[in-house]
């Protein structure tokens, strides 16, 4: 009888500690069809599903795990600049790149809106969501989804937050020491660099307000055409942005102020290293002088980098180290014996192998974070967008070096040999790795907590700054400055009149 009573009490107590939350309906909207944007945060969506939430992912890729309450809607539209390759972009100015990428994404999203599956999702009145994740990357028309489903939005930034989204949510952005992510600067800028940073940042803001919003408004109208809602403008809809989950960490960039609704989750895509396939493990274990891992990202078309590729191959011929290179085999016919080429390798698992001595990368933000996490020095060869900014940070932290895509074979060989022989780079990498890993909560737990926080408090409007309700001239106190200037001017005029009267 006592045993039965104890079991009953244990059962009642266990019920008290069961999480009473009911699974919410979450829509993940990832319109840009780039795998490097989909793969890093998929573990977050999987974890939300495993916690009981119903997660629907609208993207260009199929899900990698089969979970009962985790479903996908896969679209087939392609971004034009991905189809033609990114090689030509590196030859253009940064303003040209900004405008080009913006225009291509605008045209692409106009086509994406007509996707039959998306239209079916929007027209089904029985479909409801409690929260929407959206990718913050030049496709702000998707803010209209918050009105259609009457729910808050969490923005996903796959790099340090772009200034336009900092301004949308009220996060302070000071040009004097916060560089634009598309510029090759760090937080320590000379006078001329600060001028360039301010001009470029103001240009992108003006472009957003006077050009981009017109395209976004068109997308809003198209998305809401099947609803009976009155015409809404993009400025009103952007207020539904409740939180930003950003892949940014002060140790891997620079220190900057953030509002409480801008959350750092840098490294969320990094999972514990897994055992390597036997052939790769043997290749690494048997490398007497270590291994160099090479990956130039997923968007770099080899046809636009043949000069760089040939120079790298010739450099590798002269090294004692073995090389694992993620590339297309058909572009090289005479591959050295110390080089293993394949179209895919488990990057984080290779970087964490003790024999991995150097990472040659395009300077992508995720690659930089994985290099820091794994304590591996990096040679960055940037092509476009934020990659120049990332490699500038690499040099600032002294965990690697930067090389041009047009670098000669001799220059590349010199840089590689210095990174392999100078132990300072390795020590700095280990130090940065220690700082990067030292956090009170893992990036995954942080993202889950704040996602469910927004769900609990229905958008958590109490976290929003009053700055989002100010005009730009109020934010920079221009009206106050003009007011006091006017008072001073009036006083000077009065004094002038008074002295004239005295001198008569």
UniProtKB/Swiss-Prot annotation:
It comes from the Eukaryota. Residues 1-23 form the signal peptide. Its main location: membrane. Keywords: Endoplasmic reticulum, Glycoprotein, Glycosyltransferase, Membrane, Microsome, Signal, Transferase, Transmembrane, Transmembrane helix. It is a single-pass type I membrane protein. Its EC number is 2.4.1.-. Residues 24-474 are lumenal. One of its GO terms (cellular component) is membrane. Disulfide bonds: none annotated. InterPro entries: UDP-glycosyltransferase, UDP_glucos_trans, UDP_glycos_trans_CS. GO terms for molecular function: UDP-glycosyltransferase activity. It is found in: Microsome membrane. It is an enzyme of class 2 (transferase). Glycans are attached at residues 54, 66, 69, 422. It holds the Pfam family UDPGT. The chain crosses the membrane at residues 475-495. Residues 496-504 are cytoplasmic. Catalyzes the transfer of a glycosyl group from a UDP-sugar to an acceptor molecule. Belongs to the UDP-glycosyltransferase family. This is UDP-glycosyltransferase UGT4. The lineage of its organism: Eukaryota, Metazoa, Ecdysozoa, Arthropoda, Hexapoda. The gene is UGT4.
């Amino acid at each position: 009888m006592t045993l039965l009573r104890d079991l009953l009490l244990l059962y009642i107590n266990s019920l008290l500690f069961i999480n009473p939350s009911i699974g919410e309906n979450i829509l993940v909207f990832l319109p840009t069809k780039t795998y490097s944007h989909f793969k890093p945060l998929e573990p977050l969506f999987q974890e939300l599903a495993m916690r009981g939430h119903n997660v629907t992912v609208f993207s260009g890729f199929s899900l990698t795990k089969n979970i009962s309450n985790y479903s996908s809607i896969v679209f087939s539209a392609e971004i034009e600049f991905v189809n033609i390759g990114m090689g030509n972009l590196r030859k253009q100015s940064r303003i040209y790149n900004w405008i080009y990428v913006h225009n291509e994404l605008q045209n692409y999203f106009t086509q994406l809106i007509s996707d039959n599956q998306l239209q079916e999702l929007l027209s089904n009145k029985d479909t409801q969501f409690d929260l929407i994740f959206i990718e913050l990357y030049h496709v702000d028309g998707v803010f209209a989804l918050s009105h259609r489903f009457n729910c808050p939005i969490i923005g996903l930034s796959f790099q340090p937050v772009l200034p336009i989204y900092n301004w949308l949510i009220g996060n302070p952005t000071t040009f004097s020491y916060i560089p634009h992510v598309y510029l090759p600067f760090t937080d320590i800028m000379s006078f001329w660099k600060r001028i360039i940073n301010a001009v470029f940042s103001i240009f992108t803001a003006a472009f957003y307000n006077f050009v981009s919003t017109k395209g976004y408004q068109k997308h809003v109208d198209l998305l809401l055409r099947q609803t009976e809602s009155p015409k809404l403008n993009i400025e009103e809809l952007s207020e539904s942005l409740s939180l930003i989950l950003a892949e940014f960490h002060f140790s891997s960039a620079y220190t900057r102020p953030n509002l409480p609704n801008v959350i750092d989750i840098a490294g969320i895509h990094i999972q514990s290293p897994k055992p390597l396939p036997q052939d790769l493990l043997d290749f690494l274990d048997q490398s007497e002088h270590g291994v160099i891992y090479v990956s130039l990202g997923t968007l770099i078309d080899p046809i636009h980098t043949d000069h760089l590729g040939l120079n790298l191959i010739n450099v590798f011929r002269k090294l004692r180290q073995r090389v694992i290179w993620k590339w297309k085999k058909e572009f090289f016919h005479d591959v050295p014996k110390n080089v293993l080429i394949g179209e895919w390798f488990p990057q984080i698992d290779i970087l964490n192998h003790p024999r991995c001595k150097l990472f040659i990368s395009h300077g992508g933000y995720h690659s930089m974070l994985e290099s820091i996490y794994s304590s591996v020095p990096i040679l960055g060869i940037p092509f476009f967008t934020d990659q120049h900014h990332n490699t500038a940070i690499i040099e600032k932290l002294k965990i690697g070096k930067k090389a041009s895509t047009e670098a000669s074979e001799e220059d590349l060989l010199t840089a590689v040999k210095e990174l392999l022989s100078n132990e300072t780079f390795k020590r700095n990498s280990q130090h940065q790795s220690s700082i990067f890993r030292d956090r009170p909560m893992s990036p995954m737990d942080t993202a889950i907590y704040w996602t469910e926080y927004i769900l609990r408090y229905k958008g958590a409007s109490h976290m929003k700054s009053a700055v989002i309700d100010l005009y730009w001239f109020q934010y920079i106190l221009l009206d106050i400055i003009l007011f006091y200037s006017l008072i001073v001017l009036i006083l000077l005029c009065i004094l002038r009149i008074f002295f004239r009267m005295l001198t008569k």
